[in-house]
């Protein structure tokens, strides 16, 4: 009787079964942080879009460690986070079967990008979504109904959540449908939460009002899709010896004769990637303001530091590959992040209470790399490149063409 001589742990985890494509593209938040009434009312989640990665140089703050007060280089991910718009409020009551929604209140005006989310084909539709909800704000009966709904929230509801959508038009994507999600309000009493939700209807919320510097957050999203993959790539099983008949990247024995079926615990080929996952404990290194105007001047230097005073934007030279420019507010987190470029990532406040020194460490950035990510970039800004390369031939040709055009225009004017 043949059998294995040695035992070994199984390859891969079965905790994520079934390994199939996610049913949703946007990361779903299945749990919110525990409420604390002593804190002011605040949102617990935000929507961001993955732009790309770069690296930073910072000074380590680890007393007792060999690298304390020394410079360390770390990889970071940049997520573009344009302001979100609050368009509704939902009140939940506690039942023996869990939370159940009691009342919904929608804002009077919903943007086109938000209403597009509720249609499969916007151009063939009648575009009448939320017309009844908006009419409530104009007639007397509707206003009474809205006031009654808010009174129900105050009297019966234990959990208040707001409905907010991203502003997809502010980022350089072809998509026109905004992403809509429910976000739980934490902090304060129920009266404070209802008041906050009512005051912020149709108003933008900045990411800086939700998260803070050096905060630990969670990233919820869908991983990068890999398609149909073999068992070795999908489960990281051991390759068979070189002389094995009919392939090496296989499982040699997929089970016993009886029971006469393949067990669900056996590694098999199939879908890899595009799975819904939650990554916890991502530290925020910087929350940067987008390109804005202040005192009549356009402010772009959101990648400069106290040590690097260069006037530069977080967008690297040539833009982030397969994404482009980051012109809105952004969040820079340590390390990598799930998903491909342009993938929507739901950022959530951490569910845990952090006590580790690495989580409480204060981050002081010295340098943010903005060189080209298409290759081995050498220059941080176009000014650096111009100073090193000198005047280029194409620039000289443009100047000559402009001079020729100006001379021809002057000659025409003189002759006339």
Curated annotation (Swiss-Prot):
Q: Which SUPFAM superfamilies match?
A: Translation proteins (SSF50447)
Coiled-coil spans in chain: none
Chief location of this protein?
cytoplasm
Family membership noted in the UniProt record: Belongs to the universal ribosomal protein uL3 family.
Listed InterPro entries: L3_arc_euk, Ribosomal_L3_dom_3_arc_sf, Ribosomal_uL3, Ribosomal_uL3_CS, Transl_B-barrel_sf
From the Swiss-Prot or TrEMBL record, what is one GO molecular function term? structural constituent of ribosome
Which GO annotations describe the biological process of this protein?
cytoplasmic translation; translation
Task: State the UniProt keywords alphabetically.
Answer: Cytoplasm, Ribonucleoprotein, Ribosomal protein
Q: Which GO terms describe its cellular component?
A: cytosolic large ribosomal subunit; cytosolic ribosome
Where in or outside the cell is it found?
Answer: Cytoplasm
Q: Provide the protein name.
A: Large ribosomal subunit protein uL3
> According to its UniProt entry, what is the function of this protein?
The L3 protein is a component of the large subunit of cytoplasmic ribosomes.
Q: Specify the species.
A: Drosophila melanogaster (Fruit fly)
């Amino acid at each position: 009787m043949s059998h294995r001589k040695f035992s070994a742990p199984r390859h891969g985890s079965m905790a994520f079964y079934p390994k199939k494509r996610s049913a949703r593209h946007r990361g779903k938040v299945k749990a919110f942080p525990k409420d604390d009434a002593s804190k002011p009312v605040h949102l617990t989640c935000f929507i961001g879009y993955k732009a790309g990665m770069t690296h930073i140089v910072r000074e380590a703050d680890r007393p007792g460690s060999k690298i304390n007060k020394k410079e360390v280089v770390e990889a970071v991910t940049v997520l573009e986070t344009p302001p979100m718009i609050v368009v509704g409020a939902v009140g939940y009551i506690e039942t023996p079967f869990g939370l159940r929604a009691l009342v919904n209140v929608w804002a009077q005006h919903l943007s086109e990008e938000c209403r597009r989310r509720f249609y499969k084909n916007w151009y063939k539709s009648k575009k009448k979504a939320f017309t009844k909800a908006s009419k409530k704000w104009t007639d007397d009966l509707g206003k009474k109904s809205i006031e009654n709904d808010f009174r129900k929230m105050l009297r019966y509801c234990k959990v208040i959540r707001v409905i907010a959508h991203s502003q997809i038009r502010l980022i350089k994507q072809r998509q026109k449908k905004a992403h809509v999600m429910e976000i739980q309000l934490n902090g304060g009493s129920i009266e404070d939460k209802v008041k906050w939700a009512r005051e912020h209807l149709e108003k933008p919320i900045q990411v800086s009002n939700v998260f803070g510097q050096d905060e630990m957050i969670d990233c919820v999203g869908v991983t990068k899709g890999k398609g149909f993959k073999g068992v070795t790539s999908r489960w990281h099983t051991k390759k068979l010896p070189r002389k094995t008949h009919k392939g090496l990247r296989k499982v040699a024995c997929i089970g016993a004769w009886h029971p006469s079926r393949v067990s669900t615990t056996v590694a098999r080929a199939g879908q890899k990637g595009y799975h819904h996952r939650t990554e916890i404990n991502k530290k925020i290194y910087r929350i940067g303001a987008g390109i804005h105007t202040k005192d009549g001047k356009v402010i772009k230097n959101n990648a400069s530091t106290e040590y690097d005073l260069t006037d530069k934007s977080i967008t690297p030279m040539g833009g982030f590959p397969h994404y482009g420019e980051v012109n809105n507010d952004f969040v820079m987190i340590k390390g990598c992040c799930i998903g491909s470029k342009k993938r929507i990532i739901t950022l959530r406040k951490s569910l845990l209470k952090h006590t580790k020194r690495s989580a409480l460490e204060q981050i002081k950035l010295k340098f943010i790399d903005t060189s080209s990510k298409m290759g081995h970039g050498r220059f941080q800004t176009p000014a650096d490149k111009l100073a090193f390369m000198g005047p280029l031939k194409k620039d000289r040709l443009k100047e000559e063409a402009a001079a020729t055009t100006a001379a021809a225009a002057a000659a025409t004017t003189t002759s006339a």
